[in-house]
Amino acid sequence: MNILSRALRRPKSPTPNGKKRINLALQGGGAHGAFTWGVLDELLNDERIEIEGMSGTSAGAVNAVMVADGLTRGGPEEARKRLSDFWRAASRDGDMSKLNRAISERLFSLIPIAVTPFQPWFDAMSRMLSPYDLNPLNINPLKDLIERFVDFEGLRADARPLFVAATNVQTGKLRVFTRENISAEAVMASACLPAIFRAVEIDGVPYWDGGYLGNPVLFPFFRATETEDVLIVQINPLERKTLPTSTREIVARANEITFNSSLQSELRAIEFVQRLIDQGRLPHGMGPSQYRYVRVHRIVLEGLGERFSG
């Protein structure tokens, strides 16, 4: 939490009550989504902070809608409770089929994927069969969990900006779902890993995981919110000090690079725009033809050594 502590020492985006207003951008695509839960629990418990807007992709989208739903229902404490209840339900063993268990582990495991008991079985099967073969009934435990925990009608009525990213399979373009059109299907689309699930269709358009094109998306914040501070909760490491040599390690690292590429591009664009503002080549301000400074902070999942979990 050191990066956040440094950002809070000199609040530049205060609310009338003196709190630090931030936008939260929650990454997905990794095996450690519960790390984000822990970070969010601390942030929601910090009375210095107020969340203005949220963006999430894949598991990050799931966490974002859980927080948004809790804030709408009863504030930070309710958001903490809903996160806790959801993650405990997602990790509960229960009476699941082998397929359901493997899918749940792949999406929500509280421990690295490489050591979950059904993952080797599922990996082997998914190399031979597509989700249309392996999962003919289109079973998706995520859908049941999302619908059980989130009041989407109430969420759509809330004023807090919310953005969920998905990938249009046919056009290869990014789709950002906003608060006004958020739904369980939109969250499922954002978390639709194509090796596991059939594409999620919304209004006849098929979608896959949003991590391919926006993990997470930052640009919607710049017009929809006032704060200039964006806090990214990042679970895919940008750098590795060791060279992957096994098949599992190579696949894991390739996935990390793939699911970080869009974030890298957005961060470069932010830096470029701010350099042009400093040079006086772009107008600075909040107007429709003006550009803003953005202060980006990151909390990164580290300390797991150089072990890969694919």
Spell out what each predicted region is.
Residues 6, 19-25, 30-134, 140, ...:
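Patatin-like phospholipase
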Residues 70-72, 221, 241, 254:
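Hydrophobic alpha-helical membrane context
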Residues 1-25, 160, 169-170:
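Small-residue-rich anion-binding loops in enzyme active sites
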Residues 277-288:
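A short, acidic, amphipathic alpha-helical segment used as a generic capping/interface helix at domain edges
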Residues 11-14, 34, 192-193:
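Acidic-glycine-rich active-site phosphate/pyrophosphate-binding loop
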